[in-house]
């Protein structure tokens, strides 16, 4: 079974697409920064700004639960999936083809 080309997938999917799928709403936003409630530990307040996302680098960090990573790791963590399963699931949800890696 061929693997997933995670690097190519990270280049194809923006973290903003993942935030949209998760139903996340920004409390504050400028051109490259997005802040709002954390979808990982599910912030109690809708006005929370503990979850910080760099839209340019596709990286996130929660200042409360310390969760951090890229767009694929965010999907995996919030959906409680392995990275491989998260990649497949995310591609299906976004209607994208899974980039395959044939390296063993």
Can you name each region flagged by the protein language model?
Residues 1-104:
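N-terminal structured subdomain of primase-like DNA metabolism proteins
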């Amino acid at each position: 079974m061929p693997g997933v080309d995670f690097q190519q997938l990270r280049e194809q999917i923006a973290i903003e697409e993942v935030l949209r799928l998760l139903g996340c709403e920004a409390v504050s936003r400028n051109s490259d920064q997005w802040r709002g409630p954390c979808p990982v530990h599910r912030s109690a307040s809708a006005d929370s700004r503990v979850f910080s996302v760099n839209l340019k680098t596709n990286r996130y960090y929660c200042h409360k639960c310390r969760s951090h990573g890229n767009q694929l790791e965010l999907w995996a963590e919030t959906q409680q999936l392995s990275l491989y399963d998260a990649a497949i699931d995310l591609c299906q949800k976004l209607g994208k083809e899974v980039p395959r890696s044939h390296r063993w």
